[in-house]
Amino acid sequence: MELNQVLEKKEQILQYLGTLVGLHEKALSDVNSASQVTSIRKDITICLNDLCRINDLLVSHDGLLKREIGSLLRDKQELLELNEREQLLWKERKSWHIEQETDAAPADYVIDKDAIITISSHHRTSLNKYIESVGAENTILSNTDDSDAMIEEVQNAESSADQMIRNYKLLQLSHKQAKSEIIRLETLLRDFKKDNKFIEEELKRQSGRIRSEMGNIDFHLSKIEESKHQLMKRIGFESPLTQEKSLSEKIFNLRLSSADEDYNERQTINMKNFVHMKDLIELKIEDLQEQLTRNKNESSTVLTQRELWLDCQKKVGDLESKLITKLRSSSNSKIPPNEMSEMINSTIQYLNNLLDSSDEKLTTTLISNERDVLSKACEELHSESTTPQDGSSALPSKPIDIHKSHKGSNASSNLKQPSTPSFLVASKSPPKIGISESVVNANKNDAISKKVE
């Protein structure tokens, strides 16, 4: 049975016991209800036995309170371990976080001299000499509107054959050099493009590996979150920091370039939840430890109450048995008032001694009820013994009514100490035990009142 159920049963028994105390007083003072006294006494005894069993169940070596405290201590240790693992994972995840692209090279980055490529433009030397030889205005660079035929006619008139051949050779050399340099640049460009393609493929591959590592970390974070949710349910904790999405949903939606504020917000929420959960567990442990101490003290008190009540019952039962025996052995079924008063006074004195040793309201009330009815009987006996009547002296009405309700062996069996049924086994009633819901429900007082009346 769970701790809360046991505590609930204990409260029900206490409520029912309080009702029985009132019924006990009423039954003792009402002649018409005298037949119910034995049943009510048994119910009170059963309730006290049940309270003793419940307290034993709570405070024993492996009692419910100690088990609950042990469970909470394990929950606290689990929470601390989960938080430690979670913080390590968040720290590791941060180390895998890719910052936004930057143009700045690392501080330890050194350029390899062999990687420096010099681009030449030798064709420009030949080309410049050609332009100087013929003149820029006599080339297609000129903005003149003259036709090519007119330019060619002027050049032919001003240049000799050797000059023209030399200019032609300069153009050939420049052309050859330009083609050679273009080929070199195109080759270099192809190499650059090939390198760039390789870089892009490697970026994808490395990005995938980084995502895989982060995904693995996120997976473990989600598992920790599931464990923390289960722990929250066990300790009855509801986070005041509600989120639109669960941590798992948010965590798997993170990108490599996720905003730092999401990361920081998640860490803040986790840390606050951890602090709240830890505080709640510690408060529960403290409360249960106080309960344990309180119940240990109550166990001693309830045991004392039960023993006093059993002593009271035994003494009253012995008195009733003696009176019944004397009534049977008497020739006219009568007992002299003085003799009866002595027997009752002896019991009253014993009950007074019990009251002196008790400072608990429950047993004080119950024993006082039993003593008071005996005192009243003594007063009636004393009154009758001092007032002569015709014929034989009449016995007091109340004691006679109580005792005559027990006949033969039934009277003796009713005065025996009732055996206590198994704990929480309501089906073994009558009498009903203190934890029966049918007895301690909202209508229990009416039902029991009808029983007495």
UniProtKB/Swiss-Prot annotation:
Cellular component annotations (GO), alphabetically ordered: phagophore assembly site membrane
Organism: Saccharomyces cerevisiae (strain YJM789) (Baker's yeast)
Signal sequence interval, chain numbering: none
Coiled-coil residue windows: 144-213
Annotated function: Required for cytoplasm to vacuole transport (Cvt) vesicle formation and efficient autophagy. Plays a role in ATG protein retrieval from the pre-autophagosomal structure (PAS) and is especially required for autophagy-dependent cycling of ATG9. Also plays a role in regulation of filamentous growth.
Polar residues composition-biased segments: 384-395, 408-422
Keyword Hydrolase (UniProt): no
GO biological process: autophagy; protein transport
Topology in the lipid bilayer: Peripheral membrane protein
Chain residue ranges for the region called Disordered: 380-428, 434-453
Keyword flag Coiled coil: yes
Membrane-spanning segments: none
Protein name (database record): Autophagy-related protein 23
Keyword annotations of the record: Autophagy, Coiled coil, Cytoplasm, Membrane, Protein transport, Transport
Localization per Swiss-Prot or TrEMBL: Cytoplasm; Preautophagosomal structure membrane; Membrane
Quaternary context: Forms a complex with ATG9 and ATG27.
Annotated family: Belongs to the ATG23 family.
